[in-house]
């Protein structure tokens, strides 16, 4: 076959309809190719199943979706994308587990036969009984045992050592130390946002006895506006004198580096969707007039957001500005906290043993 015939054959194949090319490729599919496709589909199903049952991956995917939606649309349509996220991707959208697909472990409940004669202790809504806490602690110890056995088995396999099955559980001292640190971590996080309980302390004029009365003994309602970030965890770890460098660097990768790798155009909302979330009516901005009339040198953004005279567009701009300033301040604070811990660890004391010695004067005292 001449070169001219080969070129004409190639051109004929290129000009052929795509349907004919696909149909021809299907005819040449071998049994090995089918097995490969079957294995690939099984692998994808397995990955999708692990994605559905992995809590951390589920929450991080939800965070990425919100972050990238804002990043791709907030420059020109901040109000619209903000309303879209609030109405379509609510906080309960990321709740876990999904009762329709995953069984709730219910660590706050304990099912057992109660002997007759013991009264059932009622628990207030939002409270957890001591028995439920003990049950949750036992489940935590089981998880710690599993992780401990995993690392021991890996180390034994690498060094060709046989382990005693009865000695694979994590020592009580280590597990107790881990639980104490977790209690301290959560207690510190709770103290940052908890409402302080007030007491009225008075002294009786006749008996000189001191009486303490609780001012507000009504049940507290959960504040759903409070949200924790990795800054709170890293900050609390530094307060506990823990080395949070690795966690801090990993957090920067998850929440700063990885979102920047995605292309924004893939997450831009169509105009048909954005039109549904336009402002109800166009009104003139009152923000400049409000700022010009005030006598204060500094006005908190939170105070401006509560002003009913501002339009939705003005409030959206202030919310975006407040979010950016808050994130920047939190990033700086967390960085200096981690850096301060490292400086304390590497700091060499200026005092030596000779500084503790006192030189006595010569002669008789």
Curated annotation (Swiss-Prot):
Q: What is this protein called?
A: RNA polymerase I-specific transcription initiation factor RRN9
The signal peptide stretch is: none
Query: Any idea which GO molecular function terms this record carries?
Result: RNA polymerase I general transcription initiation factor activity; TBP-class protein binding
Which family is it part of? Belongs to the RRN9 family.
The protein's assembly and partners: Component of the UAF (upstream activation factor) complex which consists of UAF30, RRN5, RRN9, RRN10, and histones H3 and H4. Interacts with SPT15 and RRN7.
Q: A single Pfam family, by name?
A: RRN9
Classification of source organism = Eukaryota, Fungi, Dikarya, Ascomycota, Saccharomycotina
Q: Which UniProt keywords apply?
A: Nucleus, Transcription, Transcription regulation
Superkingdom assignment: Eukaryota
A single cellular component GO annotation: nucleolus
Purpose of the protein: Component of the UAF (upstream activation factor) complex which interacts with the upstream element of the RNA polymerase I promoter and forms a stable preinitiation complex. Together with SPT15/TBP UAF seems to stimulate basal transcription to a fully activated level.
Gene Ontology BP terms = nucleolar large rRNA transcription by RNA polymerase I; positive regulation of transcription by RNA polymerase I
Q: Which InterPro entries match?
A: Rrn9_dom
Subcellular location(s): the record lists: Nucleus, Nucleolus
